[in-house]
UniProtKB/Swiss-Prot annotation:
This is Tryptophan synthase alpha chain. Tetramer of two alpha and two beta chains. It comes from Helicobacter pylori (strain P12). NCBIfam families: trpA. InterPro entries: Aldolase_TIM, RibuloseP-bd_barrel, Trp_synthase_alpha_AS, Trp_synthase_suA. Gene3D superfamilies: Aldolase class I.
Length: 262
């Protein structure tokens, strides 16, 4: 219900969803908690939080570096503890996880979904799991009332876009371009055709990700028909550039979010 309530409220206000991505535990768990609280108080629509992984193949150099920083002290138990603290801090904001398949399957699929439900998580996106393998997780997601998010890529066939639209809950993660994550000066591709195809199959909101780093990108995404954006690399870069000064980091994050939301 948290995603539904969020999108209904934004629609009434004629606003786009703005969802930031950061890696849990980057640069450490204490700062990570403060970073995410700053995102919430700055007015973001929802959260997309990554579980650090040793081989994040879908990510570019900026987010890869955040995984490596977090991995110095990361653990599943600490991730779950931080998620509980965030849910206690704010009972209303939608919390989504972005994880790699190996982490989930090594933990145990059903156990993982049960655990994150207990932590107050709303959705999961598995970065490196193709749609064809969806049955490996859908039953556990449904059992524990976790919304499973799937990716719609520019190279996908119409059939695959249909599958992504029909099986995604909460929202559909729509890629602005192929390749890996990373901030861009311009949005390289027009995703309007993909978004139009997705909306023909399902009313589930389509969020645009990969390369979102400027307010102009959000305006472009709205013109393409997207319901919101996910922004990761530009935000994680601020963390990377202020590792020696927490206060400066939080102020710059606050300023960045304030400049992106409209």
């Amino acid at each position: 219900m948290r995603y539904q309530n969020m999108f209904e409220t934004l629609k009434k206000q004629d606003k786009m969803a703005f969802i930031p991505f950061v890696t849990l535990g980057d640069p450490n768990y204490e700062w990570s908690f403060e970073i995410i609280k700053t995102l919430i108080t700055s007015g973001v629509s929802a959260l997309e939080l990554g579980f650090a992984f040793s081989d994040p193949v879908a990510d570019g150099v900026t987010i890869q570096a955040s995984h490596l920083r977090a991995l110095k002290h990361a653990s599943m138990a600490k991730n779950f503890q931080l998620l509980r603290a965030l849910r206690d801090y704010n009972p209303h904001i939608p919390i989504g996880l972005l994880a790699y398949a190996n982490l989930i399957f090594s933990y145990g699929v059903d156990g993982f979904y049960a655990q994150i439900k207990e932590c107050g998580v709303d959705s999961v996106l598995i970065a490196d799991m193709p749609l064809i393998e969806k049955e490996l997780v859908i039953k556990s997601a449904q059992k524990h009332q976790i919304k499973q998010i799937f990716i719609a890529s520019p190279n996908a066939s119409v059939k695959d876009l249909e599958q992504a639209a029909m099986h995604s809950q909460g929202y559909i993660y729509t890629l602005a371009r192929s390749g890996v994550t990373g901030a861009s000066r311009i949005l390289e591709n027009d995703a309007s055709a993909i978004i139009k195809t997705l909306k023909a199959f399902s009313p589930t909101p389509a969020l645009l990700g990969f390369g979102i780093s400027q307010k102009e990108h959000i305006k472009n995404a709205k013109e393409m028909g997207a319901d919101g954006v996910i922004c990761g690399s530009a935000l994680v870069k601020i963390i990377e550039e202020n590792l020696n000064n927490e206060n400066a980091m939080l102020e710059k994050i606050k300023g960045f979010i304030g400049g992106m939301i409209f």
